[in-house]
Amino acid sequence: MAKGGFPGGFNINNMIKQAQQMQEEIKKMQEELMQKTVEATAGGGMVKAVANGRKELVSIEINPDVVDKDDVETLEDLVLAAVNQALRNAEEMIASEMAKITGGLNIPGLF
């Protein structure tokens, strides 16, 4: 039996080393994701929302043509739609980057 190993070739030391390496890669990826952004639009581009890789909204742009004081509800709906889609896009970006590191394993609580 190999040092640090178990019958059948399982080596706890290698497993710990791999986990530490994955942890370092995840930390690096989290830092990189802070710099990446995704955007979404609503109303044919009248409202644009931008989110970063931490699922934080970083900007909202509203075309002045969509602002109507007599129809605030439409503007509210457009903002909600753009923000929600931007956050979904950020989630997809994060999942895609995580899959590169974890090989597609779903590890709860990483983000």
Curated annotation (Swiss-Prot):
GO MF assignments: DNA binding
Keywords from the UniProt entry: Cytoplasm, DNA-binding
Cellular component, GO annotation: bacterial nucleoid; cytosol
UniProt-listed Pfam families: YbaB_DNA_bd (PF02575)
InterPro entries membership: YbaB-like_sf (IPR036894), YbaB/EbfC (IPR004401)
Keyword set includes DNA-binding: yes
Domain of life per record: Bacteria
Protein's cellular compartments: Cytoplasm, Nucleoid
Keyword presence, Cell division: no
Coarse class of the protein's main subcellular location: cytoplasm
Biological role stated in the UniProt entry: Binds to DNA and alters its conformation. May be involved in regulation of gene expression, nucleoid organization and DNA protection.
Subunit details: Homodimer.
Family statement drawn from the similarity comment of this UniProt entry: Belongs to the YbaB/EbfC family.
Protein name from the UniProt record: Nucleoid-associated protein Teth39_2199
Naturally occurring in which organism (per UniProt): Thermoanaerobacter pseudethanolicus (strain ATCC 33223 / 39E)
